[in-house]
Design a protein with these regions (language model features):
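PRPP-associated nucleotide enzymes
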Residues: 1-382
């Protein structure tokens, strides 16, 4: 999977271009990635993955589950974290840091990252390709400036640098739609592989009979535009709408044009969302598309479920609204009793992707794409 110089877009002409010394590495992270930057980033990701796999020792590496009886972690009653390693589980390296490892893990929060980092340090920092359905704070891409002048700091970058120090050289994860996550990985010297669950979510929608010949795709803000375009192409539907999101006095408002309302009339509208958090964004879209647009049905394909606070009530779910999401994160509300939320498994797909990678599957090849799609996955469409 070598990138020839004529394959490189956006002025990239060197066959072995270096992300760290590129202009893209120095971009202002407070700004959204442009389409051109996303295209360049995708090439850097592919090149980094190729460079990582020039080391043939990964073909003989052990695939280890860090979520098993050999490794446990959690919290003491005082909420402090702990990590334990089974007595018989010895370090996998000889002290020279030249051992290679595939490790699958189910991360939920920063304590899980700390435990993973500590376990890898205990194993004497093997050169690790880590696979996880979720990586904490991976949506933290733009530092927000508040009304009082204070600025949000990005916690994600610190976590990524920490796991790189513990030996992580490659990271396979389910993408939350933010190109900032692989950007931070590349900055830290980690080759990222960002995967999308859209194929699996669509298959579930088809299985449940939610799709028909009057489908139109939608997104509620520019952040999901790339995934909406991927969805449009995947479904081969010719039309889509693009909402504009803004926040006013604590409320999220999504606006659509009269032309958008005309397009959705009597149609099934399919959204792609990174998460369902408080439900504010989707509630605004749902209200308008049903009341002003006269949409027939709304299907929400969400990478992660959160359902914080009264999100379920705010969304006003009924038979016209269906949410399909994954088990990549644990929701804050009990969604098992909802007739309008379907959860598909994705955590169990990560070890299978690691196995394919160990076998030398090129995920950018036609064969690699087909094998990912069999798992309900695809390379994320930046």
């Amino acid at each position: 999977m070598h990138l020839e110089s004529n394959d490189l877009a956006g002025g990239l002409s060197d066959e072995r271009f270096n992300f760290v010394t590129s202009g893209l590495a120095d971009r202002d992270i407070s700004q959204r990635f442009s389409d051109k930057e996303k295209s360049e980033l995708a090439l850097y990701i592919q090149q980094a993955w190729e460079n990582l796999h020039q080391d043939a020792q990964y073909r003989q590496a052990e695939i280890l589950s860090l979520t098993s009886e050999n490794f446990t972690w959690g919290k003491y009653p005082d909420a402090e974290a702990y990590a334990r390693v089974a007595q018989h589980r010895q370090p996998v390296t000889n002290g020279k840091h030249d051992t290679h490892l595939y490790a699958s893990v189910n991360l939920e929060d920063s304590d899980d990252v700390l435990a993973t980092q500590t376990i890898l340090l205990h194993l004497q920092r093997p050169n690790t390709i880590l696979g996880t359905a979720y990586f904490p704070y991976e949506r933290g891409d733009r530092p927000e400036i508040h009304a009082d002048g204070s600025q949000e700091l990005i916690l994600l970058n610190t976590l990524i640098m920490n796991i790189q120090h513990s030996g992580v050289r490659g990271l396979i994860h389910i993408s939350p739609h933010s190109p900032a996550f692989p950007w931070f990985c590349l900055k830290a010297g980690i080759a990222p592989l960002s995967l999308s669950v859209i194929p699996g979510l669509i298959k579930e929608a088809e299985k449940q009979g939610f799709l028909d010949d009057t489908v139109i795709t939608a997104n509620s803000d520019d952040g999901a535009k790339s995934s909406r375009q991927f969805l449009t192409n995947y479904l081969e539907c010719g039309d889509s709408i693009n909402g504009t999101k803004r926040k006013e006095t604590g409320k999220t408002i999504v606006t659509y044009t009269e032309e958008d309302f005309r397009k959705v009339r009597n149609k099934t509208v399919i959204f792609t969302e990174d998460i369902i958090s408080t439900g504010g964004t989707m509630a605004s879209s749902i209200f308008q598309l049903f009341n002003q647009g006269q949409a027939k049905r709304i299907i929400i394909l969400a990478t992660y479920p959160i359902f914080a606070g009264n999100a379920l009530e705010r969304l006003g779910l009924d038979s016209r609204i269906q949410i399909i999401t994954t088990d990549g994160r644990t929701p804050m509300a009990d969604i098992t009793k909802s007739n309008y939320v379907t959860v598909i498994p994705v955590k169990d797909k990560i070890p299978k992707v690691l196995e394919l990678d160990k076998q030398g599957v090129n995920f950018w090849s036609q064969t690699g794409k087909e094998k990912l799609e069999e798992l309900g996955l695809s390379i994320f469409p930046w």
